[in-house]
Regions:
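N-terminal glycine-rich phosphate-binding loop for ADP-containing cofactors
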Residues: 1-196
């Protein structure tokens, strides 16, 4: 491949991602950046099968949904990265893609999802406790709360209910048991039913 930057955006399953990386790193141009669009899997897990040289060129570029309308992009770096490449990638994403770009450390959910997924889970949990309809919940937990006009349930659906289930599993695995996120990370019966 002749690309300067290759973005992996497959399902949130580490086994599939590792197989893809094996193929990408065999074919890529030497020195090109390879990134994952994961929303929750730590870079240390994603890169565990990469060589030290490959790790220098690997990072996470987490684009928020809907990508066309959401300005935020998180670049998650590791201690292995060539920081000049990360800086160049950030500049490209800001100037050429028009993204508001944050450089993040490798923490569960990075920055945006650590806050955003928690807020979505709290909103959905409270909506069910209050016996709100989905429409009522989306009216309250939408634009007035800084969530896209889809509202919280609409956003959950837009992201992908099955993807959100994988994200929650990743958070549950990575966060300590006493973390407040664990209180709201349990499956919501309606969501579970929709996945089945």
């Amino acid at each position: 491949g002749e690309a300067d930057w290759i973005v992996e955006a497959v399902v949130e399953r580490i086994d599939i991602k590792h197989k893809i990386y094996e193929k990408i790193f065999k074919e890529r141009k030497s020195g090109s950046i390879v990134s994952s669009n994961t929303s929750s899997i730590p870079i240390k897990v994603l890169s565990e099968k990469l060589s030290e040289e490959e790790k220098k060129d690997f990072c996470i570029t987490h684009f928020f949904n809907p990508v066309r309308y959401m300005d935020l992009l998180e670049i998650v770096k590791s201690e292995n990265n060539d920081l000049n490449k990360i800086s160049s990638l950030k500049k490209f994403c800001e100037k050429d893609l028009g993204k508001g770009t944050l450089i993040c450390n490798d923490t569960p959910g990075f920055l945006g999802n650590r806050i955003g997924v928690y807020a979505m889970q709290v909103a959905m949990t409270e909506a069910f406790k209050m016996k709100l309809t989905i429409e009522e919940a989306d009216a309250v937990f939408g634009r007035p709360m800084g969530i896209p006009k889809t509202g919280v349930f609409g956003l959950y659906d837009l992201i992908g209910i099955d993807l959100m289930a994988d994200v929650l599993k990743s958070f549950i695995k990575e966060l300590p048991e006493n973390d407040e996120f664990q209180q709201v990370a349990k499956e919501i019966p309606l969501v579970k039913k929709l996945i089945e």
